């Protein structure tokens, strides 16, 4: 059984890059992509992803408060991982207000994304074949720059 990921980002280039990164990971399947909070709510409700991988800065962010988005998505996903190019205090607070378990820097996703899912999404398990592959891999063993966000 694979981990179902819904990828939410306003940039086509970033969505494509992350999709390619996850495509190479055993046991993880990108089941959809969203480019706005409106799409995120609809797709999370319909697809019920295990992991919601989202940028907290979206084109329609003025129309959707974090409280509204959080109330609609938390019922249908097990774990939220926020990603952003900005890792300042305001973005960390924003990610936390959406219910994110962690905020990752987009510049470090190659090394940090899979380890972060394993660390911060304990109810989601990556198959053992992936774990053994990771142990033999030359990639870094774990996240190096992410910070855990305490859920409200």
Model-derived regions, located:
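Conserved phosphotransfer microenvironments
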Residues: 53-71
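Alpha4 helix (beta4-alpha4-beta5 surface) of REC/receiver domains from two-component response regulators
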Residues: 64, 86-104, 108, 115
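A generic structural motif
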Residues: 26-31
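Acidic, metal-coordinating helix/loop segments flanking the phosphotransfer/catalytic sites
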Residues: 33-51, 59
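Conserved phosphotransfer cores of two-component systems
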Residues: 45-47, 70-78, 98
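Conserved acidic segment of CheY-like receiver
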Residues: 2-13, 18, 22, 52
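Hydrophobic/aromatic residues positioned on beta-strands within the core alpha/beta folds
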Residues: 82-83
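CheY-like receiver
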Residues: 112-117, 124-152
């Amino acid at each position: 059984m694979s981990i179902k990921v819904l990828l939410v980002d306003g940039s086509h280039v970033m969505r494509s890059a992350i999709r390619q990164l996850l495509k190479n990971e055993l046991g993880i399947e990108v089941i959809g992509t969203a480019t706005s909070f409106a799409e995120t709510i609809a797709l999370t409700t319909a697809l019920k992803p295990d992991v919601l991988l989202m940028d907290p800065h979206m084109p329609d962010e003025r129309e959707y408060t974090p409280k509204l988005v959080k109330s609609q998505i938390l019922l249908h996903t097990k774990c939220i991982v926020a990603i952003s190019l900005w890792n300042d205090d305001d973005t960390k607070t924003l990610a936390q207000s959406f219910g994110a378990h962690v905020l990752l820097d987009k510049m470090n996703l190659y090394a940090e994304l899979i380890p972060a899912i394993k660390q911060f999404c304990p109810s989601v398990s990556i198959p053992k074949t992936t774990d053994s592959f990771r142990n033999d891999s030359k990639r870094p063993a774990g996240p190096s720059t992410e910070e855990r966000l305490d859920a409200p």
